Each structure stands twice: as structure tokens, then as C-alpha cells.
């Protein structure tokens, strides 16, 4: 049993992550019966069920449609507001726009960063897009 929890505690934890990720209807299905996006949300649930202090997410929205991506980013934002640290690797401006801090990494080194000091997701997305344009032009080194 996961993390040595008793089955009843596990079921409560399972539903607490399954409902926000909209996978509660998938719990009795086999992997071949669900879509790629549903599998992605199940993977997130597996990562969250033990309530880790640090969540590492590598392209968590890669297999998701835009609605599911937005919902997942809301889950991550809520987790972060409740004290969990979320470190996410992404190429998605939309996914990064909700972050408090965005690091731009090139050749394994941090070469620029942005802090979100109260910007809306739209405003932060614009800052990220502008920074990416400057990086591509070579304006930031």
C-alpha cells in the first residue's frame, strides 16, 4: 500500500487528487482504454497522492488539450499556494505564465530570469514572450 497508508486513508487521498484532475471516472479502466491526456493526468495524480513538498514536472501539459492544460496549471497554482514547491520544465508560455519565477536555461546554465510580482497570467505571458524574442535575437546574453 502506497506510503504505508491503510486502505481507507488511501481511498480518501485518491479521491482528493482524482476529482480535481477529472480522473475519478477512469479509476477502474485499463491504460489502453484511456487517452494520452487522461494518462498524463493519471501520472500527475500518482505524483501528488503522497503530498510531496517538492513536485518536479517535466512538460506536464505536453499531452493535454488547452482546457486540461489550464485546469492542471490551476491545480499546480493551488498546490503552490498551499505550501508545495512546484518546479516545472516547459516550453509552453501559457504554462509558465502562472509561475512566480521563470528561469531561462541555455546549455545547462541559467542566463535570464523573470519574477512575477503580481502580474496577471496574460501580462506574465507577454513578459515571457518578449524575453524569448530578445533571447532569439541575441539581445540578452
Task: Please place each PLM-identified region on the residue numbering.
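Hydrophobic anchor residue at the start of the ABC signature
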Residues: 44, 72
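Conserved beta-strand-loop-alpha-helix hinge in the C-terminal portion
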Residues: 109-133
Amino acid at each position: 500500500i502506497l506510503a504505508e497508508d491503510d486502505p481507507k486513508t488511501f481511498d480518501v487521498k485518491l479521491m482528493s487528487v482524482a476529482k480535481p484532475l477529472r480522473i475519478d471516472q477512469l479509476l477502474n479502466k485499463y491504460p489502453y482504454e484511456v487517452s494520452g491526456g487522461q494518462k498524463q493526468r493519471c501520472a500527475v495524480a500518482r505524483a501528488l497522492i503522497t503530498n510531496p513538498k517538492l513536485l518536479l514536472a517535466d512538460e506536464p501539459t505536453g499531452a493535454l488539450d488547452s482546457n486540461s492544460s489550464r485546469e492542471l496549471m490551476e491545480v499546480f497554482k493551488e498546490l503552490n499556494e498551499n505550501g508545495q514547491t512546484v518546479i516545472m520544465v516547459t516550453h509552453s508560455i501559457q504554462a509558465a505564465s502562472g509561475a512566480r519565477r521563470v528561469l531561462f536555461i541555455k546549455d545547462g546554465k541559467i542566463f535570464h530570469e523573470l519574477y512575477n510580482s503580481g502580474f496577471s497570467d496574460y501580462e506574465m505571458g507577454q513578459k515571457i514572450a518578449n524575453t524569448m524574442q530578445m533571447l532569439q535575437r541575441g539581445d540578452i546574453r
